């Protein structure tokens, strides 16, 4: 017997017998009814434990609509509509913010009806009328269309706020920290201020303002909705960028020989020049790793170069999917989070083996047993991998700096700028913010995957390596991004610098609180590695507990930000 909620995948829970007969008869042979009416849908709450505290994944029965209390009273009441996936709504009164129970994904019209029910019930329950409605910025979200119509009907203002900023504010509000903080907001997708897809962001934030001060390296997400499920597309796109970049630089830098020939055994570098044999072939990498056929690669490359069915993205979620595909763990996801969670499980298996090796070594030392020849072999192999990585990373960063300094136009960068200009109010130049070089990390993992033949042991070690290095990249970028941001501000406003500006710069540079948020931080391994590294670097780390880090927490961030932005604007 399987007992679960009564609903189709992606649809809200069925509330009455008539709907159950219509929608659920194909799912079961018998429908057991009851004469007690269901007034309010209530999904099961789902949570994990992190440092002996709840870490919410889905906030619903037993937790919603318990409020989040802020220290400051607000004069306005807010209705926040949330995002598109894992939707919730939040209503506010004074200093209390009430997130609703889980509504679900709004791709199904039945979920829109459930959203309307939830809004009506929350407003009635707390006897409030909103002064303002707030929603996401994405122009094609059903939640945005719903909010626009509702604001028009209620004749009240509508405020649209950036997705990842609201993730950060949600984490701040739950922890009672008004900022400023440095937010690390990693998720699958969100509409960026520059018209591209964001998802791997470093954000300077307060309750009422934000600046994007860093991100993972932008990449072309080719294939529309398919690319959200098919990680191999993201990996192939990164290989295309690698080929274009080294081809553009020509003979000005040394590149690892294995980038030219994945089968090469030597560790020596070779000079890259304009001859074909010294330019890496992304297609060779993609086919050797079993990501796609030559034909699929060529079709995708043509689409990318033409900018067809292509968006520019900094999605951290898609990077996890790509690495999972590169390692042969999941070429594509069968369900949400499939590739990323499988990658995490592989990484955890390797970490457990490292821990066991440490334990065996400790027991061996306690018994004065010196015959354990294999003791420490995993650690030795991993240290060798880290040594190779450091060498590769320095070489590839030098290549990128050389490209920038010489003003060489790389084809993929041209595509990025063109797509930005077509879709955005402004062009957010990636060269003016801190970049987390996930592209270099994926290139290295691809090389190592080819070298180890995607063996089970190799997959596990490289899975852990990915989590380990990404967390270290985040630490480095959090430390570096404020400085780069201040340098950018000083350059832009050099003719207007005064004492107030200098004090603001000092405040930005002195921030020592980091918020880890977004659905990617449901990955407990990444969250722990990043949190521990930031703490060792002297940062206070705030994370979620009773509010989900995923899009289920967005509406809280929207409501808190909207109330403070509204109040600040009316004080001016």
Please state what every model-predicted region is.
Residues 136, 155-167, 512-517, 522-524, ...:
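Conserved phosphate-binding/catalytic loops in two-lobed NTP-binding clefts
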Residues 83-122, 237, 245-262, 267, ...:
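A contiguous, well-structured pocket-lining segment that forms one wall/lid of small-molecule binding clefts
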Residues 78-80, 134, 181-185, 313, ...:
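Short glycine-aspartate micro-motif
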Residues 164-186, 190-192, 231-240, 468, ...:
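Glycine-rich phosphate-binding/hydrolytic loop that grips phosphoryl groups
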Residues 211-225, 304-308, 539-545:
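Short beta-alpha connecting loops at secondary-structure transitions
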Residues 191-192, 197-216, 289-299, 531:
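Flexible glycine/proline-rich, aromatic-decorated loop/lid segments
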Residues 2, 6-8, 12, 187-197, ...:
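Conserved phosphate/anionic-ligand binding catalytic regions in large, soluble enzymes, centered on
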Residues 1-134, 138-150, 196:
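Active-site-adjacent structural elements in enzyme catalytic cores
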